[in-house]
Amino acid sequence: PEETSSGDRYLRPNKLDNNQEVEFIVLEEDPVEYWQTFGENIVDQTAKAFRFPVTAEPPTNEEILEAMGGSFRRSKCKFDNPKQGLVKGKTDSPPVHCYVWPIYNLDKNCIQVFEVSQPSIFKQIKTKTGLKKYRKGIDLDSEFSCTLHKLEDGYTKYTFDVCDREEDEKRDEKIADEWETLKKDGFDIDQLVLGGDPFNPEGDS
């Protein structure tokens, strides 16, 4: 596969354009989960994700600040959320429960990490994949692919769906080979929780 930039290695719903739909195949059905929050570098204000293993309760402010180590401060909320008592630009952005899956993006023809931090999307994934039709799975061995559509109209709405995959044995074999090669090369999605790069677990430059 061609070299891809780090941005191409992740499918993040909030990065989709308005009215964009992406189609992908799930490569492993069980997601990796973690708490995630963002910090801002106190020198140049660049953002960095800080991740924590999933426990019953989100990490405390003390745990977050300890992980940030003094060179980052907590990012502020980008939106008001009266239900959660969050004020845009004032309240610390709270940790969110994330779910990630390795996927094959059929539009970009590459393996990516699909990261979901939006409860509305995860709820749809859980509901759709729980249907009797998909009880044997929706991974590469199945006949299905998934779509995610983003629409901004006053607020952002995401629609997740499972659909019949266009039959193409050669393509599916190519995807399976790429996935096996990537795993042999050390791909490790659990690295995300440890602050590492799943595509480069050894940290090679």
PLM regions and their residue ranges:
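OB-fold ssDNA-binding interfaces and closely related basic DNA-contact patches used
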Residues: P1-V113, S120-K123, T127-R135, Q191, ...
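Compact mixed alphabeta submodule
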Residues: N109-S205
